[in-house]
């Protein structure tokens, strides 16, 4: 009834009803894309439910049938120009009326599109608008061939009349067209037009009639306004206005495509694989999906595909997730291979018997029941995947071997490739040894095996037989090992061939193994396939690849069998097969020898080279290959250690098209530092693209001329030797390649210079990999041979020769063979560094030996000789007159190579070379030796001096044959004594002073005994002492032919008190004890704080002591006629700079009233400082006096001896406990605590909003904070901090752009309460700021320097403050913050306009803003290297965020700057600095009292008085004041700390507060406390009771001395120069793990402006090294301060460095570069020497008792502490 009313009154409820029905027609769970002509029934299922609820009777709602309806025939006209459908005739109004078209009319008010003017369009009647439900066409359209009569007679036979159809909704936008089309297609289907809707291929089931065409046309234009159609639809309709079907066809096609894409993505995202299906099927499925997406222009990367696949793996495949988790370069093919590998392994492991063959090559797994059957299978993950291109047969998984074994050559089995075969056994067979033929115990069902047949097995990679009756050419097996699945050995007795003679006369042979321990004779289909024979299980035959039938196969049980009648029996002897032990390899060269001789090349290259005959006179069979593939060379592991492989495929493909020597790759390596000038520091390498031939050329520099000469040489060489022209040279973009000179060179010769792109080193892979390979070889060869580093290029040269001669794994020929050259002659090669004896054809005397020991390097380029290094001459020679030194394995003995004897092998390999001592040599005259035998290949000289330690390793002694750790000290008979003294055996020089420090004498105060075991040595030492003169100069003349050779420091040691002792050298290689009193360490090891109270009585003692001043301005090292001036860097002004001028005005202890020789009086004023080595972090506080050191901390070192090596030798040979590293077992918690100190967060000193206001019970304080809060809000609004015009919804903004904000409250030093609105920059997203921007503030040293200069120059000091400084800087990024709490807008956001405090970029923005203003508006310039220090001709400004300190000689100049600043910023004058009376400042926490022209005092008394009582530390508990911050002799207990977690956190928090405050005080001005603060700061995370007590004592001392100030006085008279001095000191090994404490104090014109105390970053091995480390740390800051002083004050500057280490001064002064080359600290010492000489730095000695830097490195007694600090802080 309801439907009738709707039909009768179409205008009623039109809008609402239609809307409600439409909303029900689109189910939420329906896929909107799954619509096409083929699946419309499913899509329409839900909508029909809606229509069915409003069905009406045919008489009231259905369209009445028109029995007079006649459908016209389609016109026979050509098809339209767009589309395959026939052109329909136009519909006339009469036809439309005759077809009841009035039902489909539309209101006239609808806008008429231009295609409505078509003749086929009939304008609807305005009195009958389109109803809500449209009746469908009464009949379906007939086939075109039907006549009108047929249609009119049986209209109901063609279609079923449907009820009213729900019309589609009107198209509302262009974007919704695809969705609208789906509803429109459903509408047409419901209108009985589904069979004319084209599918995605444009195909339709029948042609439409005119009436149907008009119906579609009119409904389409009625519900799809033209202006809302997509562009592609408009284009179709503009060409043919009625071509609606083309639109529908393309729409369906698009929907199908989108639908398939979605299905593919869903399938790819939901991939699952557990091995239930084959891996190949899974791979094909995934690849098909990816390929289909690729065809739709959707590329799925390998990484994404791998991630989706890995997500769905389960079962045994799940472990691949962890394997690929960290990989960034995942390959899909590699992942499929891994899956296939696991699938095959699981399939093999799950089968216990051969598979059951079925027709059509199908098979299934059938388990076996034989209990004792031996079924072999693969258990390794290196399973070889069968090539899918080959025909696959059914697998019987009873045997399989590794892929290497399956590839064995038919003619010969390479035993090294089959050393480990894995087999499986169901019952874990325990078989006999490999050489014994054991009898297996097995029970085989008679129905299970077919007698006299071979079981055909596709799973076995080798054929196995139980009887040797059919085995031809059998050889006993000695290497092949096969194990079952339980890894039990299964012996293989023999290997041989099976010969087949098939029925058609075809003969073939396959490899087979003989073992009696298997259940069946197994025939491998893999072996048959190698002979082009396959098994056809459809016809049960063996066939050739051409289809020829060879033999039938029989199916018996579950398996297929081949009769043994086709096997040809053999007559082999059992004795031959089982006699394995008697077959031994004889006269074979050991692989390690060949590995060494061929430059430590890898196994595959050597083996392949021998197979290809790339090395002559040596065959593959001549080498013992057992375990060669697994051999690990220690030198290779060390020398070739690398992080990862080079990225493959970086070379472009087109490079492969060049001919040999047309395309070169080149690269430069270097520099190699610390080499003599004659040694090359670089090399340039070239690689030919085609042949991979390599060249290397040495370079001493990278200048254009040097590079050009090399290119000229290589091009000429290639042109003349290979008749080729270089066309392209590939290089990187280094300046040595991109210069104009080389570019012009290439242009003139028509060579293309191919450069890599910017920062793309991977494109230069060929040259980069070559350099890496050569350097790996170089390091390996040098390490193996033990030769010095300056021979590094010889190692590179040797490696190049070898690499050119070997076959690489990727090539079939070596580079020499590619180039057409002969292979490498093995008889011309010696192992790199092989000891040899070279004939000396021109000896100094006829009675001198004619042989010189040397080391073979590489074959000569320019002759048939060999390049040999002669250590005695420091030269390399090109000669053929040498003989190999036997029984010497160079440095290999350290890796237990002693058991390898290669001498006989070397003799056989080099038998073709005749040495100069061969018998036939005697017939030649010695005059026939040409001069070229000793022509210098490279004049490499380390130094002409006879230095003591040219060879730090005992293996470098070419004649050292004894393998014991004790070296021989006598020169060998074969060497001239003169030569050995100067060049080859430095130990002979040591024999003159045969002394050694025994284990009790090092670190433990041992005694020294005279030599009684070596008379010769003893007499030498006695004579030397007897000839000792009374002056140092006489001693110098006695010790050397050339004074420069040895230097002063090699002759004597000078005690700090002025006494001189002979330079006591000792021979570490003789077990000699000797004794004397008060042993004195050498210069290198002298403690910087040692002073003797019991001087040794000697000839020169009194004279020296009497002339020693308090400040030693002329140290004993310089007391010679050649060293009268102690300054290090003499220049034009050095005459005016003396020690007195440097030491003048320094706040040093006043010791002038003490006699320098009266050491006992000195010790009265400066108490003993006990120091000992300890594991304590406060170590160095016990047992010995710093002024009375009678115990040697370390045995004296000889000249040029590497200290770190001495320490290792001592640990290994001397067993000295004092040098052992600290035991960490009992200190594990302490160590962890010390290491974790860096992660300590600062203690919060501010209050949150709830703490300051909401829950604050102090009403007065709360009111002050409220007032501060409103004041801050007002300031923020005044500065337009955020956009107040608009509030943003929190949900509409990207979360990472939202910055959390908060209010923080604190009380300032002046008592005012401060509130600040800040951003939470700690959780700010990295994308919201530029990490490269820097926030700078003035350095404290810059402030102290400026204050010091202001005092000396009577400057006015003005202090300013800029309110809300950060808010003056705009913000560039789009950021939002939450409104302040009082606004109550929790869900709203404000957009920031200014740089709010707390943002990461705010500091940098403010710095750039104020910097720009000061430079542009105030005419200031920032001092280079010192941020926030600005100056002009009159004013200096130090900027610290919003605080400004102005310094000027004229106060008006300061006022002028203030006036300019106030124009832009809210500037407050804190202190103008007027008047001549004392003015007090509070500058950055420092309380400064300043009176112009008189003094300046810096302290923190008020601040400390206020803050210290709030720390809850019991101050003055007993009323006793501490007079020093700490006392020597206190040690921190290292026992584990057992404490509750809550108590631990509480104590750590307390330590943070205490040490934080102490650090602030020490950093500002209390430099005397820095050592104690630094030590306790390392124990913040170890808050034991002892550590807390020591911290309390430090706080107590700060409280007791809170009134102390850093005192500066104006320099009077004013000097024309500024003097900048640093005083340095170090305390050796007094920190955990023998780390040293270093300290430096900086003084400007006598005023202490800064100090530093820290633990050395490196573990020093001697006192000298610690002092050098301290000095090297001080010089960079000294130079920076020098630059600052010169910028702020234009006076000349004198820079000085004071240290109490004479050995350090000696090192700085020395010009000998070789002395420290092999030392651990040699690099730092040589750099220090360069810095001193290059910066005009004056270095002087200062006595320890006057070194005020001592307070920075160790705890001192009260008197000493006061004496060193009372002049500069009191």
Curated annotation (Swiss-Prot):
Binding site for Mg(2+) 3: 1625, 1667, 1700
Keyword Hydrolase: yes
Biased composition (Polar residues): 1-11, 19-39, 49-60, 366-390, 399-408, 415-435, 1009-1024, 1065-1082
Residues given in the record as Mg(2+) 1 binding sites: 667, 732
GO molecular function, one term: RNA-DNA hybrid ribonuclease activity
Domain RNase H Ty1/copia-type positions: 1625-1767
Annotated stretches, region: RNA-binding: 295-397
Region called Integrase-type zinc finger-like, residue ranges: 579-636
Record-annotated Integrase catalytic domain positions: 656-831
Site, Cleavage: residue positions: 397-398, 578-579, 1232-1233
Domain (Reverse transcriptase Ty1/copia-type): residue spans on this chain: 1353-1491
Modification(s) after translation: Initially, virus-like particles (VLPs) are composed of the structural unprocessed proteins Gag and Gag-Pol, and also contain the host initiator methionine tRNA (tRNA(i)-Met) which serves as a primer for minus-strand DNA synthesis, and a dimer of genomic Ty RNA. Processing of the polyproteins occurs within the particle and proceeds by an ordered pathway, called maturation.
A biological process from GO: DNA recombination
GO cellular component: cytoplasm; nucleus
Entry's EC annotation: 3.4.23.-, 2.7.7.49, 2.7.7.7, 3.1.26.4
Cysteines engaged in disulfide bonds, as pairs: none
Residues that coordinate or bind Mg(2+) 2: 1361, 1442-1443
Lineage: superkingdom: Eukaryota
Domain-level remarks: The C-terminal RNA-binding region of CA is sufficient for all its nucleocapsid-like chaperone activities.
Note, other: Retrotransposons are mobile genetic entities that are able to replicate via an RNA intermediate and a reverse transcription step. In contrast to retroviruses, retrotransposons are non-infectious, lack an envelope and remain intracellular. Ty2 retrotransposons belong to the copia elements (pseudoviridae).
Name of the protein: Transposon Ty2-DR3 Gag-Pol polyprotein
């Amino acid at each position: 009834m309801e439907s009738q009313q709707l039909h009768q009154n179409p205008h009623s409820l039109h809008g609402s009803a239609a809307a409600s029905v439409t909303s029900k027609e689109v189910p939420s769970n329906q896929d909107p894309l799954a619509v096409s002509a083929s699946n419309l029934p499913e899509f329409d299922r839900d909508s029909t439910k809606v229509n069915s609820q409003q069905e009406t009777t045919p008489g009231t709602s259905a369209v009445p049938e028109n029995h007079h309806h006649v459908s016209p025939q389609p016109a026979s006209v050509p098809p339209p120009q767009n589309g395959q459908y026939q052109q329909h005739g136009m519909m006339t109004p009469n036809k439309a009326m005759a077809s009841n078209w009035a039902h489909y009319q539309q209101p006239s008010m609808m806008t008429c599109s231009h295609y409505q003017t078509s003749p086929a369009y009939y304008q609807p009647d305005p009195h009958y608008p389109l109803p809500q439900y449209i009746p469908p066409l009464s009949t379906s359209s007939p086939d075109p061939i039907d006549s009108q009569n047929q249609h009119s007679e049986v209209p109901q036979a063609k279609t079923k009349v449907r009820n009213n159809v729900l019309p589609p909704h009107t198209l509302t936008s262009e974007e919704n067209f695809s969705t609208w089309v789906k509803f429109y297609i459903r509408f047409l289907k419901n209108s009985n037009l589904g069979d004319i809707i084209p599918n995605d291929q444009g195909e339709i089931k029948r042609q439409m009639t005119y009436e149907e065409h008009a119906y579609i046309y009119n409904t389409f234009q009625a519900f799809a306004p033209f202006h809302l159609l997509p562009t592609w639809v408009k284009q179709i309709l503009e060409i043919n206005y009625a071509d609606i079907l083309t639109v529908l066809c393309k729409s369906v096609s698009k929907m199908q495509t989108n639908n398939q894409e979605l299905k593919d993505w869903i399938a790819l995202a939901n991939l699952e694989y557990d091995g239930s299906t084959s891996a190949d099927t899974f791979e094909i499925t995934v690849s098909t999906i990816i390929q289909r997406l690729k065809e739709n222009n959707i590329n799925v990367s390998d990484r994404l595909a791998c991630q989706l696949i890995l997500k769905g793996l389960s079962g045994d495949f799940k472990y691949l997730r962890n394997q690929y988790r960290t990989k960034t370069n995942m390959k899909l093919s590699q992942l499929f291979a891994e899956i296939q590998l696991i699938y095959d392994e699981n399939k093999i492991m799950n089968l216990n018997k051969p598979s059951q063959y079925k027709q059509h090559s199908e098979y299934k797994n059938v388990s076996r029941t034989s209990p004792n059957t031996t079924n072999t299978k693969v258990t390794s993950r290196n399973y070889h995947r069968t090539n899918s291109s080959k025909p696959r047969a059914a697998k019987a998984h009873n045997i399989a071997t590794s892929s290497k074994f399956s590839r064995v050559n038919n003619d010969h089995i390479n035993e090294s490739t089959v050393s480990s075969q894995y087999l499986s056994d169901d019952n874990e067979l325990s078989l006999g040894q490999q050489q014994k033929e054991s009898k297996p115990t097995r029970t085989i069902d008679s129905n299970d095996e077919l007698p006299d047949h071979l079981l055909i097995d596709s799973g076995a990679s080798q054929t196995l037989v139980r009887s040797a009756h059919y085995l031809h050419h059998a050889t006993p097996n000695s290497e092949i090992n096969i194990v079952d699945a339980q890894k039990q050995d299964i012996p293989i007795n023999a290997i041989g061939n099976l010969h087949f003679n098939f029925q058609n006369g075809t003969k073939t042979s396959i490899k087979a193994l003989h073992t009696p321990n298997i259940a069946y004779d197994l025939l491998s289909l893999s072996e048959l396939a190698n002979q082009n024979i396959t098994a056809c299980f459809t016809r049960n035959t063996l066939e050739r690849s051409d289809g020829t039938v060879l033999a039938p196969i029989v199916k018996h049980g579950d398996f297929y069998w081949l009769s043994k009648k086709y096997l040809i029996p053999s007559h082999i002897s059992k004795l031959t097969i089982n006699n394995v032990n008697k077959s031994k390899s004889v006269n074979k060269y050991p692989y390690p020898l060949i590995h060494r001789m061929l430059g430590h090349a890898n196994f595959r290259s050597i083996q392949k080279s021998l197979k290809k005959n790339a090395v002559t006179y040596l065959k593959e069979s001549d080498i013992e290959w057992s375990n060669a593939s697994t051999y690990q060379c220690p030198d290779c592991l060390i020398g070739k250690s690398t992080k990862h492989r080079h990225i493959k495929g970086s070379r472009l493909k087109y490079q492969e098209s060049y001919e040999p020597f047309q395309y070169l790759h080149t690269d430069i390596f270097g520099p190699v530092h610390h080499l003599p000038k004659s040694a090359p520091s670089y090399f340039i390498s070239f690689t030919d693209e085609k042949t991979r031939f390599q060249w290397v050329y040495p370079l001493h520099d990278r200048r254009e001329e040097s590079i050009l000469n090399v290119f000229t040489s290589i091009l000429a060489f290639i042109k003349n030797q290979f008749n080729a022209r270089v066309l392209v040279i590939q290089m990187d973009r280094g300046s040595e390649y991109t210069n104009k000179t080389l570019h012009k060179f290439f242009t003139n010769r028509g060579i293309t210079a191919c450069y890599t792109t910017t920062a793309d080193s991977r494109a230069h892979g060929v040259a980069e990999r070559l350099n890496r390979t050569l350097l790996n070889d170089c390091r390996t060869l040098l390490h193996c041979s033990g030769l010095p580093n300056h021979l590094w290029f010889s190692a590179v040269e040797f490696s190049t020769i070898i690499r050119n001669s070997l076959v690489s794994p990727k090539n079939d020929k070596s580079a020499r063979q590619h180039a057409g050259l002969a292979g490498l002659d093995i008889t011309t090669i010696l192992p790199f560094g092989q000891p040899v004896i070279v004939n000396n054809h021109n000896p100094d005397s006829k009675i001198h030996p004619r042989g010189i020991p040397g080391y073979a390097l590489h074959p000569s380029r320019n002759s048939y000789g060999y390049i040999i290094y002669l250590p005695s001459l420091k030269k390399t020679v090109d000669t053929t007159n040498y003989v190999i030194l036997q029984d010497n394995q160079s440095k290999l003995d350290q890796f237990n190579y002693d058991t390898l004897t290669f001498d006989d092998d070397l003799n056989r390999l080099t038998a073709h070379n005749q040495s100069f001592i061969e018998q036939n040599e005697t017939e030649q005259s010695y005059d026939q030796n040409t001069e070229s035998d000793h022509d210098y290949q490279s004049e490499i000289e380390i130094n002409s001096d006879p230095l003591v330690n040219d060879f730090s390793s005992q293996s470098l002694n070419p004649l050292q044959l004894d393998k014991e750790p004790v070296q021989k000290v006598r020169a060998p008979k074969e060497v001239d004594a003169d030569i050995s003294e100067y060049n080859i055996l430095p130990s002979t020089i040591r024999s003159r002073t045969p002394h050694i420090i025994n284990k009790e004498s090092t670190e433990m105060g041992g005694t020294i005994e005279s030599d009684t075991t070596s008379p010769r040595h003893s007499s030498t030492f006695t004579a030397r002492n007897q000839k000792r003169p009374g002056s140092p100069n006489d001693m110098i003349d006695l010790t050397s032919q050339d004074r420069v050779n040895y230097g002063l420091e090699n002759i004597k040691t000078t005690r700090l008190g002025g006494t001189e002792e002979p330079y006591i050298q000792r021979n570490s290689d003789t077990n000699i004890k000797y004794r004397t009193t008060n042993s004195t360490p050498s210069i290198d090891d002298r403690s910087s704080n040692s002073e003797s109270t019991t001087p040794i009585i000697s000839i020169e003692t009194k004279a020296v002591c009497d002339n020693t001043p308090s400040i030693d301005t002329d140290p004993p090292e310089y007391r010679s006629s050649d060293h009268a001036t102690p300054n290090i860097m003499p220049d034009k002004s050095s005459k005016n700079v003396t020690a007195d001028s440097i030491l003048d005005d320094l706040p040093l202890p006043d010791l002038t009233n003490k006699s320098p020789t009266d050491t006992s009086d000195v010790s009265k004023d400066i108490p003993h400082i006990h120091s000992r080595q300890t594991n304590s972090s406060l170590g160095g506080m016990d047992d010995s006096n710093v002024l009375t050191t009678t115990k040697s901390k370390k045995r004296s070192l000889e000249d040029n001896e590497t200290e770190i090596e001495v320490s290792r030798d001592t640990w290994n040979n001397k067993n000295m406990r004092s040098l052992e590293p600290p035991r960490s077992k009992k200190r594990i918690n302490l160590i962890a605590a010390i290491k974790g100190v860096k992660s300590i967060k600062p203690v919060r000193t501010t209050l949150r909003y709830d703490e300051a206001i909401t829950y604050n019970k102090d009403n007065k304080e709360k009111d002050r904070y409220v007032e501060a809060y409103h004041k801050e809000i007002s300031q923020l609004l005044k500065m337009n901090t955020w956009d107040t015009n608009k509030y943003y919804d929190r949900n509409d903004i990207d979360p990472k752009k939202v910055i959390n904000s908060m209010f923080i409250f604190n009380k300032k030093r002046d008592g005012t309460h401060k509130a600040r609105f800040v951003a939470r920059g700690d959780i700010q997203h990295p994308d919201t700021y530029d990490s490269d921007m820097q926030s700078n503030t003035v350095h404290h040293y810059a402030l102290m320097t400026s204050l010091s200069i202001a005092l000396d120059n009577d400057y006015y000091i003005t202090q300013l403050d800029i309110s809300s400084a950060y808010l003056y800087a705009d913000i560039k990024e789009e950021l939002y913050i939450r409104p302040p709490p009082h606004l109550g807008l929790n869900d709203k956001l404000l957009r920031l306009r200014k740089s709010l405090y707390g943002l990461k970029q705010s500091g940098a923005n403010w710095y750039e803003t104020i910097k720009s203003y000061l430079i542009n508006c105030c005419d200031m310039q920032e001092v280079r290297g010192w941020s926030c220090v600005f100056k002009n001709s009159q004013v200096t400004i130090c900027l610290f965020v919003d605080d400004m300190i102005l310094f000027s000689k004229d106060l008006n100049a300061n006022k002028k700057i203030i006036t300019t600043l106030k124009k832009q910023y809210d500037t407050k004058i804190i202190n103008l600095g007027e008047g001549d009376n004392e003015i007090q400042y509070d500058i950055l926490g420092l309380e400064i009292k300043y009176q112009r022209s008189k003094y300046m005092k810096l302290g923190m008394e008020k601040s400390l008085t206020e803050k210290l009582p709030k720390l809850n530390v019991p101050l003055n508990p007993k009323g006793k004041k501490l007079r020093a911050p700490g006392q020597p002799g206190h040690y921190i207990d290292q026992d584990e700390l057992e404490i509750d977690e809550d108590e631990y956190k509480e104590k750590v928090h307390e330590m943070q507060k205490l040490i934080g405050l102490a650090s602030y005080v020490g950093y500002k001005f209390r430099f005397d406390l820095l050592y104690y603060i630094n030590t306790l700061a390392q124990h913040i995370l170890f808050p034991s009771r002892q550590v807390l007590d020591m911290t309390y004592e430090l706080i107590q001392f700060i409280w007791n001395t809170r009134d102390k100030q850093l005192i500066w006085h104006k320099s009077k008279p004013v000097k024309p120069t500024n003097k900048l001095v640093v005083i340095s000191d170090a305390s050796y090994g007094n920190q955990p793990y023998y780390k040293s404490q270093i300290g430096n104090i900086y003084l400007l014109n006598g005023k202490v402006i800064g100090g530093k105390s820290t633990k050395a970053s490196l573990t020093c091995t001697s006192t000298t090294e610690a002092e050098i480390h301290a000095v090297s740390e001080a010089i960079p800051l000294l130079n920076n301060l020098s630059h600052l002083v010169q910028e702020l004050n234009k006076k000349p500057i004198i820079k000085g460095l004071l240290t109490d280490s004479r050995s350090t001064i000696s090192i700085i002064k020395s010009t000998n570069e070789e002395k420290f080359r092999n030392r651990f600290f040699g690099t730092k010492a040589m750099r220090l020497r360069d810095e001193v000489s290059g910066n005009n730095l004056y270095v002087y000695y200062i006595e320890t008792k006057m070194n005020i830097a001592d307070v920075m490195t160790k705890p001192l007694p009260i008197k000493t502490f006061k004496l060193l600090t009372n002049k500069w802080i009191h």
